[in-house]
Amino acid sequence: MAGLKRAVGIGAGIAALASACAAYAASPAIVAAIHARKANYKEIGGAFKTINDEIKTGSPDLATIRPLARDLLTRASGQLKYFPKGSGPVSGEKTRAKAAIWADQATFVKLHNDMLGAARLLQAATVSGDVAAMTSARTALGGACKSCHDKFRESD
């Protein structure tokens, strides 16, 4: 009889735990937003790396970096939609987004706007072909990204 009570107790405990875990499971929309966010950042990072590498040559291939700068700006412009409430650590999904994003939206949006301004400068500089302007805009964009990452992204 004691064995049966113990088995029932363990079963009830497992059921309660499973129920609690299910209550904290992220919705499909949140999971999709997190995956889209990661994919978007991967594309932004890849574009930035290629642009940066080209600028470092001193004679960047404009045919390569112009579309990348335009794509980077487009992707950055739509970035906030990938941060719906519940898509941070509370989701239970693997994400480097800190809860501070939702706790301090004003700062997050300000830093996002700083990044957009720098991305616009970079895109305009690639259109003009002015390497000095590209270098300056690239540095500003890297700094804007770093400012946000330092405050709102978990380290590797």
Name each model-derived stretch.
Residues 26-140:
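Extracytoplasmic c-type cytochrome modules immediately beyond a signal peptide or single-pass transmembrane anchor
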Residues 13, 20-22:
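N-terminal signal peptide c-region/cleavage motif recognized by signal peptidases
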Residues 141-153:
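The canonical Cys-X-X-Cys-His
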Residues 156:
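Short Cys/His-rich "knuckle" micro-motifs
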Residues 19, 139-142:
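Processing junctions and N-termini across compartments
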Residues 1-11:
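Bacterial N-terminal signal peptides that target proteins for export
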Residues 11-12, 43:
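A periodicity- and composition-biased signal for non-globular, repetitive helical segments
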Residues 6-7, 38, 150:
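Hydrophobic alpha-helical segments, especially transmembrane helices
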